[in-house]
Amino acid sequence: MSENPKRRSRRSVLQFLGRGIIGGMVFAECVGIDQLCDGPRAWGTSQQKPDSKSQAAGDYSSFGKQAAEALRKAIRFFATEVAREGGYVWTYSADLRFRQGEGRASETTVWVQPPGTPAVGAAILRAYERTGEEEYLEAARKAGECLARGQLESGGWTYRIEFSPDARRRFFYRTRPRNEKGFNWSTLDDDTTQSALRFLMELDRVLGFGNELIHECVQYGLTRLLAVQYPCGAWPQGFREPPDPTAYPVLGATYPEEIPPAPNFKEYWRFYTLNDQAHMDTIRMLLLAAKIYGEPKYQKAAEKGGEFLLLAQMPDPQPAWAQQYNFQMHPAWARRFELPAIAGGESQDVLRVLMTLYQHTGREDFLAPIPRAVGYLKSSVLPDGRLARFYELKTNRPLYFTRDYRLTHDDQDLPTHYAFKVENCLPEIEVQCQRLRERQQPQSLRETPGPHLPPRPSLSAVERVIKTLDDRGRWVEKGRMETAGQSVGQVIRSQTFIANVDILSAYLAWLRSA
């Protein structure tokens, strides 16, 4: 098959903002660490700051009936008019004639990559747990069964699922028709397989582990994910089958003697990958699996993933992390704008997940790399207060690409599809690490799986969400669909649906708890 497990398509900043919240109730508990500095996880988060003026001016329950009706109308519209085969894409024209994910989508295509089917399904599932409305559980179940029908034989998912007979024949799905010669690369890129499993695990829990299709899909996916973990604890970006453990020695990270001037390995998705938080998302997902199923093997695999991060910390003078490593544990090329270098964004997410692992295990070695890494990264902050996405190996000079992909130290002609500067979250990371060392860490990560009271939304946010919903149950907004083939001025976004459903359901959960 010609489809690349890591397509060279356009990326937006949303891909660096959009995970975590789709993991459902339990996964959202990680917010204390994993959303430091707003972190890399923010699809639909409803953590608005309280609006003291609006709440002082009126009773917090004043929008109760309106919120319940708006939530019902919005979910019903998405589940009955927007969904295809129970699944969703990213963006729709207001009249639903055009659909797209990261690329154009047909009437029989749904998207897995956030904010696609798992993200929408998880928001609806949270709404069910917060309100008890059976209609929402049915919509979430359909989204889950849609994902189950798109699971590849390799155990995970690629970015989209096809449902037309002709298109399905190009993939090796586990469900019929099965094509053993079809595309069978599962991807951990952009939180794709991880988000599907997180949602399906939460759905499995809510359904009491009684839906055979959902439960078996999760168990198969988790089993295959454990099987493709390398001996060193890393995962590839994409996988079809387990690696031969004898072919991949366990090594610590070192600097290469020479850096190839351009990408020099065709199937770079086999490399040990931290890029776009792939490794860290996988660890978080396995910690959730350990909580939901009580299986030590998932915790063990997550810890092994953490041990890889200890191995992957570069030696001085740059004790942080690269986006990807080759099998000699040297920072390596991926795409032509993802080079062997220290990565400012991924390094911060490594620090977050190491703290999460410490919370789950109490293992001091997961905190040990943090002071050196933070000290180094603080010394590398740019004049504008941010961090560079890439720092040149050994020299530590910031690296950028021009719009025509020439490597440079100058930041004046950057492409717009990729963030070459990232937010500096080091102060928050330092504070959290100190609290953990003082045993002041939150205990929520050790709680039992299940719904917990979400952050309380402000009345002004609730009012805004209600007022912007139209009579059909749509949140229509200005926007462009570049793949529609013609100008589209008004769109419906799954990202907006997720955010607004979370606000309404969180508000109703607070009213129920009063």
Language-model features: locations:
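N-terminal secretory signal peptides
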Residues: M1-C37
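C-terminal segment of N-terminal export signals and the immediately downstream linker at the start
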Residues: R7-R8, A28-G58
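Short amphipathic alpha-helical segments enriched in leucine
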Residues: G18, I75-A79, A83, L125
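Terminal, non-catalytic domain-edge segments
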Residues: K49-F77, S195-Y220, A262-N264, R284, ...
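Extended ligand-binding groove/face enriched in aromatic
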Residues: V82-M280, Q299, P315-E338, D384-A419
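A structural motif
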Residues: D276-H279, A343-S347
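Substrate-binding/active-site clefts of carbohydrate-active enzymes
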Residues: A312
